[in-house]
Amino acid sequence: MISAFVADFDGTVTEQDTIDPLVRLAIGQLEQSDAQLENWLSLSRQYQSQSTAVDNSFFSEFSSLESFVSNFHKTVEMPALEQVVSQKFLMGLKKEQLHQLGQKTKKKKLVEQVLIKLRRKSVRIEILSANWSTDLIIGAVGEYCDLITANDLLFTNEDPITTTGEIKFKITSAQHKLSRIEQVMNTYGKTAFIGDSINDILAICHADIGILIGQNQLARQALRYFEIPFVDIQLGSDYFPDIHSGSVIGLRSWSEVDFFLKTHKLPTNHEPSNSSL
């Protein structure tokens, strides 16, 4: 049995990414919101176009998965984050609004049941997310978690309940997530990590049990291009530890996560070689 279960948040635990609703909540409070909303939509469209792989040429100049995601962070993710801060997209939010948005966020079916079952078995539960608001995540799943590691919207001493638009960054890259997974494995032992995107991929590859949930095309294309062992497991299908040990496990839903953790004999010594990254 695993000792720790670590999950990404947006798109893994949640039905939809919470970033857009978060920004729209802040922009909606402005007296003149149209221009700021258009700025946000423009940035969102640019990010989406930059994070969609059309063919293998998207990866061809990189020698490894690790070098690809490092470049993706520098050229796509960080410029977008800098725009979010410089344009003050997240200014003017109250802490209570962040909690409430988290409470209203729709979670994927069976997420809560799976987390509750794991807690009952004394498995440590962590959320590891590049989301901009830990307070939002607390509102959504705080009651199920031992630790949430994410970013924080900043407040000032003069107004400690209203966001400034600045962000205290802790987790912005795949490498940051990998570092935390290594800490969890070293501290607690056998660890499962579940994520849905390219930002999760190094942690997925390194965890004792690495699960890619959903159909994110960039993540799947990257795994194929860099020849990372990968196997899709469906409800009722067979999992063979001797064959599949070291492979990224592809699952479509939390019902499959529940079935996989509950019924499949899991490997006792899954430690993918770093040379595969």
List the predicted regions and their residue ranges.
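Alpha-helical structural motif
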Residues: E15-T18, E77, K177, S253
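C-terminal cap/substrate-recognition subdomain and adjoining C-terminal extension
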Residues: G102-L277
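A metal-dependent, Asp-based hydrolase signature
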Residues: T18-I19, I27-R124
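A broad structural signal for alpha-helix termini and local helix breaks/kinks
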Residues: S3, A26-I27, V141
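Asp-based phosphoryl-transfer active-site loop
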Residues: I2-I19, I204
